[in-house]
Structure formats: C-alpha cells, structure tokens
Amino acid sequence: MDTIVDFKALPYRKCVGILVFNYEGKVWVGRRLMTVSHANVDMSKLWQLPQGGINQGEKPIDAARRELYEETGIQSVKLIKEAQDWFEYDFPQELMGHVLNNKYRGQTQKWFSFQFTGEISEITINPPPDGNKAEFDQWKWVDLEELPSIVVSFKKHVYTQVVKEFRNSFKYL
C-alpha cells in the first residue's frame, strides 16, 4: 500500500547558496547535469548557482565555502556579503519522490557573495575535486540581472530575491 505524504507538513532543508563575482562583475553559473527529473525541462533553464546542504553543527559560511569547492573547485575567494534573510522555495509536485528522499518540502537558503581571486584553471566541474559527484556539465560568467531568466521556474522567485539582495555587491569591491 502506498503511503500518502503531506508535503506541506514536511520541513525545509537548510542550505546555502553562493554567488561568485569575477573582476568584471559577472557571476559564475553552472548548467545542471541532466537527470530523470529534468526530462521535461527547457535546457536553457538548467543554469544555477552553487548551492548545498548545511551539515549538522556546520556554520553557514563554512558550508558555503565547502559547497563551492565541492561543486566547482573554487577556493580562491574573498567574502563580500552574507544575505540578511533566508530565502526558501518548495519543490514542485513532479519532483517529489525524486529529490532528497521525500524528507523535505523544499529548501531554505542562506546566501553569500564572494569575489573570485584565483585563476580560471582552478575551476573544475566534471569531474569536480576530491571525488565529489559532478553536478554541472558546463559553466559560464553571466550578468547578475540575467539569473532569474535562466533558472528552473520553481527557483525563479529566489533568484529574483538574490539579485535584489546582491545587486550592489560588486560596487564595493
């Protein structure tokens, strides 16, 4: 017998999201590797910023640096800003059962922005460093304002908030 899950009763997973600005003020984005859950998604909407879960007892800033390295190989960064608030999104119904073992209804994210101070050769996504699982198959630098138009629809409102929050970050570098 199938168990019916009330997804609205599930908690949000605590995560971090990371913006990395280059010296021109552009932001690093990666294109998600295709999975079964992406089967009906427009390929032009598979771009996203690095993000990931916060481990038990881990500080959000430490999770941000760890996730950035695990997903991109980037370590040469300088912190610019931490978002004041947490931003959250719900997983769409069609992804339920495909993400995080149905333990969460969505994610609540603390966002950070960093200045990239390294060399392009530091960026390694497929495979990423230390045997981590690849999450991206391509990457590029884009204008911050472009972000909401290149992500999946259920994250668009969060990316709009992120753009507003970090819009002036590059001016203070």
Curated annotation (Swiss-Prot):
Gene3D superfamilies in the record: Nucleoside Triphosphate Pyrophosphohydrolase
A molecular function GO annotation: bis(5'-adenosyl)-pentaphosphatase activity
Domain of life: Bacteria
Keywords: Hydrolase
Ranges spanned by the short sequence motif Nudix box, renumbered to the chain: 52-73
Keyword Hydrolase: yes
Pfam families to which the protein is assigned, alphabetical: NUDIX
Catalytic activity, EC: 3.6.1.-
One GO biological process term: nucleoside phosphate metabolic process
Domain Nudix hydrolase: 11-164
HAMAP family named in the record: Nudix_RppH
PANTHER family: NUDIX HYDROLASE 26, CHLOROPLASTIC, UDP/ADP-SUGAR PYROPHOSPHATASE
Family in the record: Belongs to the Nudix hydrolase family. RppH subfamily.
Entries under NCBIfam families matching the protein: PRK00714.1-5
Protein name: RNA pyrophosphohydrolase
Organism per entry: Bartonella clarridgeiae
Taxon lineage: Bacteria, Pseudomonadati, Pseudomonadota, Alphaproteobacteria, Hyphomicrobiales
